[in-house]
Every structure is written in structure tokens, then in C-alpha cells.
Curated annotation (Swiss-Prot):
Subcellular location: Cytoplasm; Cytoplasmic vesicle, COPII-coated vesicle membrane; Endoplasmic reticulum membrane; Golgi apparatus membrane
Region annotated Disordered, chain positions: 1-43
Protein name (database record): Protein transport protein sec24
Function per UniProt: Component of the coat protein complex II (COPII) which promotes the formation of transport vesicles from the endoplasmic reticulum (ER). The coat has two main functions, the physical deformation of the endoplasmic reticulum membrane into vesicles and the selection of cargo molecules.
Gene Ontology molecular function, alphabetical: SNARE binding; zinc ion binding
Gene designation per UniProt: sec24
Subunit-structure text: The COPII coat is composed of at least 5 proteins: the sec23/24 complex, the sec13/31 complex, and the protein sar1. Golgi apparatus membrane; Peripheral membrane protein; Cytoplasmic side.
Gene Ontology biological-process annotations: COPII-coated vesicle cargo loading; intracellular protein transport
Source domain of life: Eukaryota
Amino acid sequence: MASQQGGYPPQEGYGQPAGYGSPTQQHAGMAAGAPVQGHAGGKKKRAYAGEAFEIGSGANAALGGQLPAGGSYGAYPPQPQAAGYQQPVYGADPSQMNAAAPGYTAPVTPGIAQMTQQFGAMGVTDPHLMPPQPPQAAVAPQAPRPVPLNQLYPTDLLTQPFNVAELDYPPPPIVLPPGTSVYPSPTANCPPKYVRSTLNAVPTTHSLLKKSKLPFALVIQPYASLRDAEDPIPVIPDQVISRCRRCRSYINPFVTFLDHGHRWRCNMCNLTNDVPQAFDWDAALQKPADRSLRPDLNHAVVEFVAPQEYMVRPPQPLVYLFLIDVSYASVTNGLLATSARCIKESLDRIPNADRRTRLGFIAVDSSLHYFSIPRDGSENSDPRMLVISDLDEPFLPIPGDLLVTLSECRENIETFLDKLQEMFQNTQNNGCAMGSALRAGYKLIAPVGGKMTVLSSSLPNVGHGSLTMREDKKVLGTSKESSLLQTANSFYKSFAVECSKAQVSVDMFLFSSQYQDVASLSNLPRYTGGQTYFYPGWNAARGEDAIKFAREFSEYLSSEIGLEAVLRVRATTGLRMNTFYGNFFNRSSDLCAFPAFPRDQAYVVEVAIDETVTKPIVCLQTAVLHTTCNGERRIRVLTLALPTTQNLADVYASADQQAIATYFSHKAVERVLSSGLEPAREALQAKAVELLSTYRKELAGGSVSGGGLQFPANLRGLPVLFLAMIKNLGLRKSAQIPTDMRSAALCLLSTLPLPLLIQYIYPKMYSLHDMPDIAGLPDEQTGEIVLPPPVNLSSERIVPYGLYLIDDGQTQFLWVGRDAVPQLLLDVFGLPDRSQLRVGKQNLPELDNDFNQRVRAVIEKSRDHRSKGVGSIVVPHLYVVKEDGEPGLRLWAQTMLVEDRADQSVSLVQWMGSLREKV
């Protein structure tokens, strides 16, 4: 099985899920339909002799394309459809075949909600520009107010089922009163890709927030790419930084100028401050500047170059210390050779504009091997290896030569990396003293700070922080399983806190085919602003494995991280930052410390309402003080303004379902680590029931008309996302999930940026055999590859002759139906016969035909993080899965179909029914 699956651990063959309605059974009855009449509209683009075509069947039948402008929330008009690869010979009545469930009915005025969404996406929030809201569609009479907020559109979750396309809608628009910002700039408010609030209309009192049962939290992702050039924002170089004397907020587009512009009133605490003398002076041109053009008054997201007083010490250089496992396991699976080659090939990509970047290397087996690398041009250019066997108190031999400047030693670093593999190629050493190596590395870089990058294939089994094999298959799926997700050795938490104080960050790259205790090791990244990257069953002999790691590690090394960073969130008087979630160390009640600030993670901050808010808007300002890779101290400031309301209907109508799901993902991980898996799953279900009950009681008049399940249009996806979370690898009830897989999933659930997290919880599925003609080709306007419309994750949407891509952002599956026609297999795989199709990890062949090129374009576009507005190093593996092929692989792919019944979990229909009963 391992060979077929390409390294997926053998124990990961999920047991045959009880009641997993296999696509085979679900479609068996459809083959007996009437013979197909007619042909595909005369299209000759893909005329396959002997193939019957139909328009309007298959998963894309009811979707057929992107949502047209003016379409209403949830109503998906049919589109012109490509004649796809359909079933061979036998026909099926298209009316029975997988027609997508109809969207819920439009509001009384067609298209209002969709237009509202589109205005929100464009940043148009002036109420005079908003379409008139239909009073007859509103729920609960509203108190008169100067600006109408978003309307509440009730829908029935049972009669109008969730459609996956709803997850692609922008959040409810932020509707601010006119004249809120000091200048009418379209960029005055923070875009959702940087900061999203769970509530886009904020209750004025704690009691109203409590009554709503909704969380008030921010999802913060200060960077939308791995490198500045990919997502430039305004940088203010003049070092004139105007801050409030009392609350220390930064001047922003929502302040008010007084006294002929000589003073400004803080929009957080109302204090009046003097405008700095140099505020209206252009230092570069040495002449007065136009204040209305200042970036900090027009842009919600800006970066200030910080003056001397923002530094505790001079900006430190970028330091990478590589701790490389050279034990028998690491040499035999190819990790040592692959990582050495990859570092060598990425030396030009490591940020080094200021030519101060420093590198160091420690090799680890049962001893520690330090390497002294001479400068280029030295008499002796050979690296020297120094072996330390005292693991309890590892000392630093000649510490001055162990961290070398990349620019000065470039050639000799390459020489060293070429020789590293040879030094250990005959090893039989099974020891791994990684804990002691971390201690030694800490001593080496603590004076300057930096990153320790661990590359390991073994369980640390000697020296500091040694761990034992504690996974017991008998406890998997039981209440005792949660203990395996806790840290086994207190060293990892206490050492992580030490690292954080010395500005040392740790990233873990873990490659074991055996148990590696990810639960313990992941504490190091968790408290130091790092990340855990997990490669189960990895082996460089499989080209796909080697290429995936090489691409990801090269991206990792080229990322422009921030150093010595702190993050703080300030807000309007009456609001308080309550709890922080993410990978960092909480240094004080409101200060998060990051020895290195990554660009591929998001953070969640829960907000408390301590006092009644009297203003029509509140502001929340995130500031990240950091040193760039190039040695410049900067402050990235992100300011978000939100309207306030005393009306519960407004709160619900402006709630952001994806931000709420992200908040509860972090809460669920916290609950797993503190109380266990079952309490976390129960808490999610209880929350879903509580929200539905509150809405019914407070806003739907308490009635249960016709046995429905009422919820607002903008939150329709929330119950589905909760179910998908409960079924995620990190939380799912199962006796088949290895502890390391689960721990790695929990790391993702608590760090992924919002778009990637939602996709990880509710993966994307695209029907490829019948995708629209424009799919897989560049859009005429944007040049971006067009994706087919997404399909709900249910086996009812899968036809036996179909080809589907299922993608959760970490792994991609190409599902080939058991009745796929030969021409489809020939076009996509270049194989005339289905029996020749190899399953498992692979890359699609590049063939000279239109359809193969489009399928490959869709697969590649689905991996494109930049178009999602996030940075990520991940390159998902592609697994080819045959519907009637290798069972373990097929069952793994089917766990992505979160709307189906599986293993020990319910289907979406059963879940909605149980929520209905409890409500």
C-alpha cells in the first residue's frame, strides 16, 4: 500500500467508514435511464467517437459558471455549459442526475444582498451609494438611526440547503456613516485580507454582545504575502510618527483635526494631541507637503520607518542556524542529502540585501557536530568538524567561527554543503540528541537572536528533552487519546519560553516514517512565532517527495521574515483585548512577542466590551513593531473602523461566518489541548445549537414554522463549517488517526491564514470532466486562470464517469470515476486503458492537447496562494485516486467529503436534523 499511496503511512488506511455511501452504490440506479438523445450542440472541440454527450448533468449542471452580477444570495442561475466528458453508451435523465440543490429564494427585491456583498468587496460603504434596502425583507423593526446597516435576510437551512459557492462571498460590508474618515479615501478602512472582525456591526454594550451569543474577535494577518514586492503597502520613510500621548495609538484615517489643523483628536481615547512640526514637511524635497496626500491619513494599512527610540538595541542581522539530523534514519531516507542540496541551491534566495545575513550548521546524532567554515580566500578552505559528546552541558568550541557571514563565506559554505552528505554516508548511529542540539544552538545565537531551523527524521532519544515512543494504538479513538496530544517532556515548553526571551525562534521540519512526537516538538514553534511542517512517510527516493520539500524549503528560506517583533492591538475606549490565539509568547496582558514574525500565519484576538460604547463607530488598531530582514526597524499599522449598534438584528446581519469559524477553530484547538477531543467536539455542537436557538428566540419570533431551521443568509455556512471542523483530521472521532497526524493538523487549525483555514476545514471540489469552456484558461480581463465553480462535498455530486479535483490546501486528490471513458483517460493521462492508470502520489503528464493543459492549469491555480491573498510555502501533493482502486487511498480521499456520513460521524443531513431537534 505504501508504494501505491506514495508514502502515506500504512496505518493511515482509515477503517471502512460505517455507512459511507459509496459513489458506486449511489449512482448504480442511474445507469438505466433512457438512451441519450441528441449531441452536444454541434461542438467539435472534443468529439470522441462513440461517446454520448449531455448538457446539464454532472456536478456542474446547476452551477455552470461564476455567479453573475446582480444574482441574489444563494440563487444560482444556470449558465451556458461546456459539453463535457459524459457517461459512455448508457444515458441518464438529467433531471435526476445530481442537479445541485436550488439556492434559497431571493429577497423581495432581487439581488440586494448580492449587490450589498459586491459593494462591500469594492469597499463602497457610503450609504448613499448602497442600493435601497427592501423594508419587507427585514426582520425585527429597527430603531431609527442615521445610517441603515446591513439587512437581515432570514433563510431556512432545511428547505434551502447550503451551497458551497456561498463560502466565496465577501464578508458583510462595513457600513460607516458618511464623513467618518478625515479624507474620502477608498483605502481608509482596513481590507479584510489583513484584518477581519467576526462582527461588522459592534454591539454598544456587553449585555447585547452576551445576548447575541456571537463572539467578538479579530482575525489578524498582518502580511498577505511572503515578500514585500508581492503585496506592497505605503511606507512612510520620514520618521515623523504622530501618536496619541495617552493611549499611544498611531495617527490614522479616522482621527479629527482641530484648531486649524494644528491639533488632532484621537479616535480611540478622545485626547487632543499636537500635530508634529514636521508632519506637513516633505523632507526628501525640502518643501511643504500636502497633508491630504499623507499615506497615514489615507491608508488603513501603512508601515512607518521607526526612529532610534523604537530600538532596544541596534537592528540585528538575519541569522539561520540549521540543526540537521544525521542519524541513520535521516541518511537512509535522503533527508540529509536533500536538505544540504536545497540549502546550497537557495543561498541566493535567502534575504541578504544588507550583506549581514549569517548562517550556522550543527549536525546531530548521538553527539553534536559543529562546523567551522573559513572565509572565502583563506589558505585552508576546508570546513572543520568539532564533535561534542557531552550532551548534558554542551559547550561551544571556538564560538566565533560557528556563525559565518553568508557574503564572506559563500563559496566555502557551498563546499561544506557538498561534503556534508559524504561525512555521514556510512553512519549506523540511531541516536538523536536534538534537545541538546537546541540547547547548544541557543547558546550560539542567543546574543544576536535569530532562527533555529530543525530538520529531523528521528524521535529525540538521548540528551536534553529526550522522548519515548508513547503512541498506543489501543487508546486511539478513546478518551485517553487526548493525553497523547499533550507534551511528554516539560523541556519543550520551558525551553521555548527561554528562546522567546532571547529573540530566538524555532521552526520544525519533521520527516519520520515512525512516531516522532509532534505533540511535544510543536511546542517550540508554538511559543516562539515559528511553525511545524510535517512530512509523514517522506522519502527522497520518491521524486514527488523530494520535489515538494525542495520547493517548500526554498520558499521558506526566501521569505522576508520580521525579527524581534511585538504585536499589540489598541481599541476605542470601552473595548479591551481579552485573549490572544496563535504562535507567539504572550509577554504581558496585551503584548505578543515574536522572535521572528512569519508571513504565513494568522492570529485571533478576542475583544471584550467593558463599558458602554457611545460613539457611532469604534476603531481597532493593530501595530507590529519589527526589524526587517534588511536591518530596518519598522512599524506596520492596520486600522479597522466598524459601526456600532444597539440592535441585535444588525449584529447578526453583519456577522462574518468565516471569521467566526476561524475563531472557533482556535478555541477548539485550545479545548483539545486543555480538556480533550470529545469536549472540543461537544463544545462546537453546543455552540451551533446555541446560535440557532438564540436567533430563533430573539429574531425569528420564537416560532418553528413548518419545522424549519431559521438562520440569516450571511451565516448559512456556519453550521456546515462547524460540522466540517468536527470531522477534520485534528478533531475527528476515529481510532485510525496516528497521533502525529492529529497533532500536525491541530497546528494548522491554529495558524493557517483565514482563506487557507476555511479550505482546510471545507475543501474545494471541482468537477473537471464537464467544466465550463472558460475553466482552465486565462480570464480575458485579469489574465488569471478561471477555476470551475466549486461543488458541495457530497458523494451525491460525484458521477461514476467523472473526473474531480478535491483540494484542502495541503493535499490534492484527482478522483477518477470507475466508468471514466477511454478518451478522457487518454486526454488527461495519456493512457488508452484504465488498468494502466497508476494511483497514488504523482504529477500529471504534460500532453499536447487542450483538455490536459486546462486540467493541469486548474490544479496549479488551485494551489495559487497569492490569488487568495495569503502567503504560504505549501505545495500540495497530488494523489490520483481510482474510485474502484486502492481502498486505503480511496477512503482517505472520501474523508474530504464532509457532507457524507463517515467512520463515527454523521452526514450533513443528519447533522442539520440533530441541530433542528436540539433547537
